[in-house]
Amino acid sequence: EYKGNVFNDIGKKWMLITAAKDGKVNTMTASWGNMGVMWGKDIVSVFIRQTRFTKEFVDNADCFSISFLDHEKYAKELSYLGTVSGRDEDKINKANLHVEFSGDVPYIEEADDVMICKKMFRQTMEPDAFIDKEALEKWYSDKNYHDMYMASIEHILEKK
């Protein structure tokens, strides 16, 4: 059971979305997402731009993790992981963070809370679907749309 404040944890503390592909692990910082219930399951929805390197990892895997770190302690690292691409360097190592695994799903060891998530649904945000055209203009003027992933929360790891 998740005991955090969803709005604070996602929107203000941020989260790391982490996945594995071909024996490698990549992560990215995200501050857009949802938690709720869909198809009778507790779910999380995350949004990943099509140009992000981490998207390749999430697309390749059945599961991914969401890690919540102490924002005050790790603000610099979270910002770095959201601006530097894993295409260019081993950014997890460079941020001085460590990867652990729950089964074959990687997560960030320093996290206070981790959700192991199994993908259920993916959809690209399409321009025609926007009712709020101001949001379309503000966030997607470059046409770099997000894919939305809905995933069931398989289990939660909490730091003791």
Where are each of the predicted segments found?
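Basic, polyanion-binding surface patches
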Residues: E1-K160
